[in-house]
């Protein structure tokens, strides 16, 4: 788990807000991939806090922890802008079976977002793993795509400027198929790992009509869910090849050799191609005989022709 530091132990650095701003720069799905050793709910709450302090309305679909536990550690200024949709206490809606939403929790959440005020909207899903266990993967992917789009339905609020979805995924609980399907929808992927008591976030950002970028940040989460970047650890940003695409060598399946040796090139140049005219035929075509009305047959034996001395046709003058 990420180590929680007190405010007296560390000195805040301005790059911490830069990391959060880069994750919240655009809309779409931001996928947080955590593990048993490196949990991601702390980073999810840090992003929620950042969005709320920027004046955005934040909707949280809580599935794994209670509302009280989720709000713990967030200030009153953040909790006042947080709308919590509780699926933890009654996930199957047994207490009110007559009011169950047949479309599912994501559809109900989408309808709530239509009534939001002007500005950007952040939707936090805690977690996608719980939803994958209760909703078919195809249905969930379709709902995520619709959820992260702006004004895709006639009933949507036209005042909503941007919809951002923060999805927490416990990667170890799922196979490569569901993880790859959800990952293909994400504009930004954050994979949490680390060494000793230091957490690292490997961030893959995909932007339309731009090359993907890859960053690694080392950080700690404070008790108030602010971030502090560690000093002395390298922060790097570089061009990143999408892991879902494989690099193909264009010369691996050629039927010919691109690079010839000197001896091979001389042998190639000495060959006579089958469609080349012999010198006799070239002269006949370039200098036709006047008055000739009959056709002529030109034959120039190849080096591998089998000449039969007893064949009477070989005596013909053609």
Swiss-Prot record:
Record's comment on post-translational modification: Tyrosine-phosphorylated.
Cross-referenced Pfam families: Elong_Iki1
Keywords: Cytoplasm, Nucleus, Phosphoprotein, tRNA processing
Ranges annotated as spanning the membrane: none
Sites of Phosphoserine modification: 270
Any one of the GO CC terms: nucleus
Location within or outside the cell: Nucleus; Cytoplasm
Family recorded in the similarity comment: Belongs to the ELP5 family.
PANTHER family given in the database record: ELONGATOR COMPLEX PROTEIN 5
Name of the protein described by the UniProt record: Elongator complex protein 5
Gene: Elp5
